[in-house]
Amino acid sequence: MAAQAAPELAKLDLNKNTGSVEANAVSAGGSEKEEAENEGDSEDDRDDEQAGGSAEVNAEKKKKKKRPKKKKKTAKVQSSPPRIPLTTLFPNNNFPEGEIVEYLNENSYRTTNEEKRHLDRMNNDFLTEYRQAAEIHRQVRQYAQKELIKPGATLTDIAEGIEDGVRHLTGHMGLEEGDSLVAGMGFPTGLNINHCAAHYSPNAGNKVVLQHGDVMKVDFGVHINGRIVDSAFTVAFDPVFDPLLTAVKEATNTGIKEAGIDVRMSDIGAAIQETMESYELELNGTSYPIKAIRNLNGHTIGQYEIHGGVNGKSVPIVKGGDQTKMEEGETYAIETFGSTGKGYVRDDMETSHYAKVPNAPSVPLRLSSAKNLYSLINKNFGTLPFCRRYLDRLGQEKYLLGLNNLVSSGLVDAYPPLCDVKGSYTAQFEHTILLRPNVKEVISRGDDY
């Protein structure tokens, strides 16, 4: 759940060669008898020498030890579809690090400061979990880009293909109680087409097919022990949309560059907007300015809490507003959205995304279906977002009444799809960054974006 709506909508990782023995012929001389004797002697000598040579060769062979056959090393290559758990490919848990960016200006001392380096080394488990999740995200999205996301594919096949890959690579299929809380999907796969910017995932029975002229945002999360990597990209098959994708990708990279310890959110937002809105898209002879979607934001990420929980912070993508500063040790989803429409999203279409409200007050539930469903949500997802397909996968049936009751009771939040005006096109790019004590790490960075 990459997108965090602005306040007004927030409510809603690979035989020694032996020489031959030669006998010397005896020179002719003397009588024929002597010649015969000498000839016989030489043959005997030759036989002796050959016998000696054979024994010597056999002795050498016995001395030589047979070298054990080298075991073939297993190539560190993921299968297609991705099914090999990442811990099998990286048995020592030395997962690839993300892009390391040194702090600049007044924070440049942090790169070499020994105290900060010591604090960073203390976060070993934290980094290992995040890097594992990030490498799973990279491997699954690369597979999705090559094999799943094609014109003619259904959104259901794409979403389930991504989610099956994540579950196999984490080693947690999520069918046993509590298994999804150990590792797995950080939130449901968002497949947002054209004017829809965020929070759309196919529900059961969805028949939507991806078209050649579509612009689709692919947004999914991977978690290990609640450490969520949140990253998204946009796919368009028609090159006419390249300026839109470039604008948003560059805006996200600007946000990543500007982010850092003690940096004000408003400064990041202003830089993002300036970059994005320097582009325009020409479509059917008409030029459309690319606008930053002003009521969508980046956000902090907490353990098991995609939007950082009660004390979460937002990262705007337009100028003005929040003067809050980023702090050491925080994790952020830096994401930007661009649109050819109004640059403002509203709730639209059927809801698929839900999440339990953290620290919600105790509320008496009258419906037994709501009570049972709430217990299942607690045991299998906790505060991690889920979608209706995940409930179907756990064998739940006829749960909508109970689910709606949990939403109306304030125990579960519903996250409807967020859309700009119909006919417009939107794009999104997103990375998870860690503000480590001595460096900034773009944990989800890959060769693709």
UniProtKB/Swiss-Prot annotation:
InterPro entries: Creatinase/aminopeptidase-like (IPR036005), Met_Aminopeptidase_Type2 (IPR050247), Pept_M24 (IPR000994), Pept_M24_MAP (IPR001714), Pept_M24A_MAP2 (IPR002468), Pept_M24A_MAP2_BS (IPR018349), WH-like_DNA-bd_sf (IPR036388), WH_DNA-bd_sf (IPR036390)
Gene3D superfamilies hit by this protein: Creatinase/methionine aminopeptidase superfamily, Winged helix-like DNA-binding domain superfamily/Winged helix DNA-binding domain
The enzyme's E.C. designation: 3.4.11.18
Pfam families: Peptidase_M24
Region of interest (Disordered), ranges: 1-91
Keywords for the protein's UniProt record, in alphabetical order: Aminopeptidase, Cytoplasm, Hydrolase, Metal-binding, Protease
Binding positions (substrate): 199, 307
Cystine connections: none
Residues annotated as binding a divalent metal cation 1: 219, 230, 430
EC class: hydrolase
Basic residues composition bias: residue spans: 61-75
Nucleotide-binding recorded as keyword: no
Reaction(s) the record says it catalyses: Release of N-terminal amino acids, preferentially methionine, from peptides and arylamides
Compartments, as annotated in UniProt: Cytoplasm
TM region(s), chain numbering: none
Binding site for a divalent metal cation 2: 230, 299, 335, 430
The keyword Lyase appears for this protein: no
Role of this protein: Cotranslationally removes the N-terminal methionine from nascent proteins. The N-terminal methionine is often cleaved when the second residue in the primary sequence is small and uncharged (Met-Ala-, Cys, Gly, Pro, Ser, Thr, or Val).
PANTHER family (alphabetical): METHIONINE AMINOPEPTIDASE 2
Family statement drawn from the similarity comment of this UniProt entry: Belongs to the peptidase M24A family. Methionine aminopeptidase eukaryotic type 2 subfamily.
Full protein name: Methionine aminopeptidase 2
UniProt lineage: Eukaryota, Fungi, Dikarya, Ascomycota, Pezizomycotina
